[in-house]
Amino acid sequence: MRRGLVLAAALLLSACARPGALPASPVPAGPGITIAATSIPLNAQDPAQDRIGDFRYAGGLALSSPDTSRFHGLSDMALVAGGALTAVTDEGDLLRARLVLDKAGRLVGLTDGRITALTNPEGRPLQGKLEGDSEGMALLANGDMLVSFEQRHRVWLYPAAGPPRPAPLPDATFPDNGGLEALAPDPAAGPDAYVAGGEESGQTWTCRVSTTCVAGPVIAKPPEFGLVAVTRLPKGRTAWLLRAWDPVRGSRVSLVVRDATTEIARMDLARPLAVDNFEALAAVAAKDGTIRFYLLSDDNFQSSQRTLLLAFDWKPKS
């Protein structure tokens, strides 16, 4: 028996003597992450295609991160000067990153990635889908951020400093998974104003942090499409993002630009074009009047879907 114990001890020491394999490079600690970006064509079957009607393709990326499992479910975003991007996820995370453009202004990458948890008014991270299903966001001019949530329907104001607090919510009933997907600042209505839209109904509201919400127009859409994002544009125009999915045709997306009464421009994305579950929309106006639109997709944490970020340029005719 003693001989057996000696042999067992020798085998144990031999097993412990070998160190485990180390990563090829250091693994980051903290919120900073690497964002891998692979350029994709607008149409994989026709890589030369660079337009959809009046919209010119300005680059597209398939995004992922080797550093975290939290880089998924991106459901809305906002952009500010210098290409700083802020996005929220379906599970209560906040992503910050910066766009990378080449010399021609085409989208080629994303850098300076950071992921942190959204918190509740007590300062604790949101827990689980029921509490953290953030779907819409709006960055106000003073740096405050508004976030709309599904499941437990609410809008919270995240001040530039301090804990979040409830913000006005439209007086309406929403399905569990069909709340205020569309949210954006509405500066023409006031410095603390935001426009909100119901996914299934297409009903919109103009809200103010300091007062309440007032019903606006209902966005016309086919019944299979949901209203998922909105952004105000110069000259009183608004861009709306509509999304549909079925197992035969897959994802379909329409970007619609309207003024108060008229549809001005429209871009439809469907197979074989680069399309996925686009839920986020942002716009940047250039000095010559061109509008750069960015569309970001929510992969639903599914390996069969992708996180895509596409850029399109549109120049109004007037």
Task: Annotate each language-model stretch with its function.
Residues 6-15:
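Bacterial N-terminal signal peptides
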